[in-house]
């Protein structure tokens, strides 16, 4: 009987160890921290893209001397709290119940962006909030703040960017919480009012411990670090190049490679020896 108990105990211990090892292996190929970070990142990049679009159309992009004109959306109603050229000025963009337009995405609800000065002027702060705002069925909440920090060493305008209390509620009812601290460099397109030639490079915020942190749809906390600047072209929905490191709590750091500059929704996720392709939502 004693021998049987010992053997049973050994077998049980071995089985537990084996199952634990299998569970750990499965968990370490989990894509949701990377995918959900991309959803949140894309949501708040798109939020800024819409603000930039409407700012350009209404003369907020540069020196407020001219407007660019309608580029895509016919359905949002855009109003201002003060006459053009006066600050602070809150731009309210109302998409109503449904508006398919800029970059082909369906939006509803309201975006509010308060400018303390022209977009391209050093010292300007832009604070963006939402009211019952949805993109392709996902509800976007939170506050995004951009501060125009003037020119960097390369002579390009750059912005410090913060997202506070970001919350994405997916169509399934699952949620992603997200906060971010970034630096956004305006690399190309500053000299024109056209949006499609604007290119931004996004890196970790100056002095920040990480680029973003959040909790994915499965309740797992994660942080991110931008290993190579994420390049955002304003005529493309997705990040076109750059490398992002994502570290879920208690798990191996993943590397998300956004590609070679092509405008597509593909990214390569690497976790140790495991590699897979993921499809970016936007």
Language-model features and meaning:
Residues 1-10:
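Bacterial N-terminal signal peptides that target proteins for export
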Residues 10, 14-16:
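Hydrophobic alpha-helical targeting segments used for export or membrane insertion
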Residues 18-21:
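C-terminal motif of bacterial Sec signal peptides marking the signal peptidase cleavage site
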Residues 23-282:
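Low-complexity, intrinsically disordered segments exposed to solvent
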């Amino acid at each position: 009987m004693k021998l049987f108990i010992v053997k049973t105990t050994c077998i049980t211990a071995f089985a537990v160890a084996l199952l634990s090892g299998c569970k750990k292996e499965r968990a370490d190929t989990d894509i949701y921290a990377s995918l959900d970070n991309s959803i949140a990142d894309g949501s708040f990049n798109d939020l800024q893209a819409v603000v930039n679009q409407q700012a350009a159309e209404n003369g907020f992009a540069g020196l407020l001397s001219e407007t660019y004109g309608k580029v895509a959306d016919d359905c949002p109603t855009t109003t201002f709290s003060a006459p053009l050229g006066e600050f602070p000025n809150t731009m309210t963009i109302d998409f109503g119940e449904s508006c398919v337009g800029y970059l082909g995405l369906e939006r509803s609800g309201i975006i509010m962006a308060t400018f303390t000065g022209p977009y391209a002027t050093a010292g300007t702060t832009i604070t963006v909030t939402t009211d019952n705002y949805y993109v392709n069925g996902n509800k976007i909440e939170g506050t995004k703040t951009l501060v125009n920090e003037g020119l960097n060493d390369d002579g390009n305008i750059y912005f410090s960017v913060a997202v506070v209390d970001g919350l994405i509620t997916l169509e399934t009812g699952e949620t992603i919480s997200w906060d971010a601290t970034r630096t956004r460099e305006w690399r190309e397109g500053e000299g024109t009012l056209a949006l499609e030639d604007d290119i931004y490079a996004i890196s970790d915020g100056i002095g920040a411990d990480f680029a973003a942190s959040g909790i994915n749809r499965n309740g797992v906390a994660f942080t991110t670090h931008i290993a190579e600047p994420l390049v955002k072209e304003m005529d493309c929905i997705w990040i076109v190049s750059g490398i992002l490191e994502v570290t879920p709590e208690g798990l191996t750091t993943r590397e998300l490679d956004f590609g070679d500059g092509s405008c597509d929704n593909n990214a390569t996720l690497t976790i140790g020896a495991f590699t897979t392709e993921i499809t970016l939502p936007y």
